Each structure stands twice: as C-alpha cells, then as structure tokens.
C-alpha cells in the first residue's frame, strides 16, 4: 500500500521581539518563507513573526517583464 504524503505542513512562527512567544500556522509545502505582523501579548504590541527553523524552499525564478528578443 502507498503512503499518502501531506501537501501541508505546520510551521512555528517566533516573535522577533525576543519575548519567547510563538504561533503555529499551516501552509502548503512549496510556499515561500513566511513573515507576518501579528500581536504579541507578552510585549502588548504588534511585532514581526518569522519562521523559527529554516526549511527547503524552491527558489522562484524572477519574472521578466522586459520585451527583449529571446
């Protein structure tokens, strides 16, 4: 029998205010790195939350909007 792999993963967002407060969110596996501005109840302010651990993210090729001949 074949095991089914999940398309989503749960990541931990850690407050950049160094309060130790963290949040967990669910994202698709191929999504870019997540940074969010959320409320931190320890410091009682909105602060930036970044991913706690590094994960493999597929590099996206930048879009080329120039009309140059290929």
UniProtKB/Swiss-Prot annotation:
GO molecular function: structural constituent of ribosome
InterPro entries: Mitoribosomal_protein_bL33 (IPR052008), Ribosomal_bL33 (IPR001705), Ribosomal_bL33_sf (IPR038584), Ribosomal_zn-bd (IPR011332)
GO cellular component, one term: mitochondrion
Keywords, comma-separated and alphabetical: Mitochondrion, Ribonucleoprotein, Ribosomal protein
Gene3D superfamilies hit by this protein: Ribosomal protein L33
GO BP: mitochondrial translation
UniProt keyword Protein transport present: no
Subcellular location: Mitochondrion
SUPFAM superfamilies, per the entry: Zn-binding ribosomal proteins (SSF57829)
Description of how the protein assembles with itself and partners: Component of the mitochondrial large ribosomal subunit (mt-LSU). Mature yeast 74S mitochondrial ribosomes consist of a small (37S) and a large (54S) subunit. The 37S small subunit contains a 15S ribosomal RNA (15S mt-rRNA) and 34 different proteins. The 54S large subunit contains a 21S rRNA (21S mt-rRNA) and 46 different proteins. bL33m stabilizes the tRNA acceptor stem in the E-site.
Known function: Component of the mitochondrial ribosome (mitoribosome), a dedicated translation machinery responsible for the synthesis of mitochondrial genome-encoded proteins, including at least some of the essential transmembrane subunits of the mitochondrial respiratory chain. The mitoribosomes are attached to the mitochondrial inner membrane and translation products are cotranslationally integrated into the membrane.
Family statement drawn from the similarity comment of this UniProt entry: Belongs to the bacterial ribosomal protein bL33 family.
Miscellaneous comment text of the record: Present with 2500 molecules/cell in log phase SD medium.
Protein name: Large ribosomal subunit protein bL33m
Organism lineage string: Eukaryota, Fungi, Dikarya, Ascomycota, Saccharomycotina
């Amino acid at each position: 029998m074949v095991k089914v792999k999940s398309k989503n993963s749960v990541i931990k967002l850690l407050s950049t205010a160094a309060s130790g407060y963290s949040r967990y969110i669910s994202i698709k596996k191929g999504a870019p790195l997540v940074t969010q501005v959320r409320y931190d109840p320890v410091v009682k302010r909105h602060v930036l939350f970044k991913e706690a651990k590094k994960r493999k993210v597929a590099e996206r090729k930048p879009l080329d909007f120039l009309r140059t001949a290929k």
